Amino acid sequence: MARRDGDSWEITESVGTTALGVASARDAETRSPNPLISDPYAGHFLAAAGDGAWNAYRFDGEPPAALVEAEPRLVERIDAMRSYVACRTKFFDDFFGDASTSGIRQAVILASGLDARAWRLDWPRDAVLFELDLPRVLAFKAETLDKQGATPRIRHVPVAVDLRDDWPAALRAGGFDVGRPAAWIAEGLLPYLPPAAQDLLFERIDTLSAPGSRIAVENFGEDFFNPETLARQRERGQAFRRVAEEMQGQDIPDVADLWYLEERTDAGEFLAGRGWRVTSETAVALLGRHGRDIPADLPDATPNSAFLFAQKAD
């Protein structure tokens, strides 16, 4: 289903299903023999959501033969995406750890989804974490974690707001201090924003950020939105999605239908133009650094993305 202005969703609908898919990958990585990250809460979200395509990374044993017939290299592709999510998660985990070590005591997660960093990471006692997402997404997460008796390891402030609306006002109302440096992350977010909304997002971050603030971004450049690349990916995935839908008895969204595919300003260039010092690492390099190289003949098994770090000049 294509996106529309002002659309919203339950966790098992539309963009919400992608948060469950990422939780599935984090859960699979956590249960693997040599996990790069640990997320003991991801499995609880999946259990609360029930059966669905979002459990794709959690096959116990071999995947169904019909799925393998539709996508012969299914296992390799699943492993590649699990590794991508694991390395991405570690990148942002480490970002927050480094920011805390540097003395930053405000953290902000934009479109937090089923992120459980408030519960699973170590934080300074005087730090605060703001999580921004739609009300129904935050409510699902809170209800699920409350049932597990989970307690945040940081002062945790959920901010129920749509990032297409006036979220800075909601953030300040939650106690965000524009006079103190902050650490921001935008993980798995940008393709789900229209180009103008992406620019406005970073304009607002710049306005809200005191000198010394930091931001980490999963960035998607021109190659990611290339129409020919997307067409090939969709064609390859059609047969797999059709078989999976027949097996599960429910529609499986084409994730590209949830993206805004228009040309947009590069996030790194945008921030650099406003005086932020920007460095970048490609996803290929990030995965390689953690020993998770993707097979050379499966270059499209993971997103063609890069991971940005930027700091606002003092």
From Swiss-Prot:
Binding site for S-adenosyl-L-methionine: D133, D162, L163
Record EC number: 2.1.1.-
Gene Ontology biological-process annotations: methylation
Any matching Pfam family: LCM
Gene3D superfamilies recorded: Vaccinia Virus protein VP39
SUPFAM superfamilies attached to this UniProt entry: S-adenosyl-L-methionine-dependent methyltransferases
Protein name per UniProt: Putative S-adenosyl-L-methionine-dependent methyltransferase MAB_3886c
Species of provenance: Mycobacteroides abscessus (strain ATCC 19977 / DSM 44196 / CCUG 20993 / CIP 104536 / JCM 13569 / NCTC 13031 / TMC 1543 / L948) (Mycobacterium abscessus)
